Amino acid sequence: MPSFDVVSELDKHEVTNAVDNAIKELDRRYDLKGKGTFEFKELTVTLTAEADFQLEAMIEILKLALVKRKIDAKCLEIKDAYASGKLMKQEVTLREGIDKELAKKIVAHIKEAKLKVQAAIQGEQVRVTGKKRDDLQEAIAALRAYDSGMPLQFNNFRD
């Protein structure tokens, strides 16, 4: 039976490149020159600046750099800014993987669409199986139209 997996993955190398591009853009911006920094560790970016409006501008720079590298900005989890001495800090976490709650919503959406496919949760991915390839393509189209709050990719397509 044909099947495919629904996953949410990030290319860590592209994320690193996007953060590096954001750092370069920060150095080029006249209004932010020398006033803010990006620190990248694993999948967390810490933004440091003197004021809230600078943090907002830095988040926009980061989002733009990620989109240029073909990474969906939906994967960002932006936490509240907090004061650290004279500076303001804010953490941005890049989310990866499908948690159980989102997996249940994806399975429910596929069932609501009344397609001739079955969906099963397997860890951090959802396996969709059907009798025909056309049914799977309809399921992919339905999931692309569905706003899950996370970027979804489809891989491991088997006939």
Curated annotation (Swiss-Prot):
* One GO cellular component term noted in the UniProt record for this chain: cytosol
Query: Per UniProt, what is one Pfam family of this protein?
Result: DUF520
Q: Spell out the molecular function terms from Gene Ontology.
A: nucleotide binding
Q: Which InterPro entries match?
A: DUF520 (IPR007551), UPF0234-like_C (IPR035571), UPF0234_N (IPR035570), YajQ-like_sf (IPR036183)
Sections of the chain in a coiled coil: none
Keyword NADP annotated:
no
Q: What does this protein do?
A: Nucleotide-binding protein.
Q: Which family does it belong to?
A: Belongs to the YajQ family.
Protein name, UniProt field: Nucleotide-binding protein PSPPH_4093
Q: Which organism is it from?
A: Pseudomonas savastanoi pv. phaseolicola (strain 1448A / Race 6) (Pseudomonas syringae pv. phaseolicola (strain 1448A / Race 6))
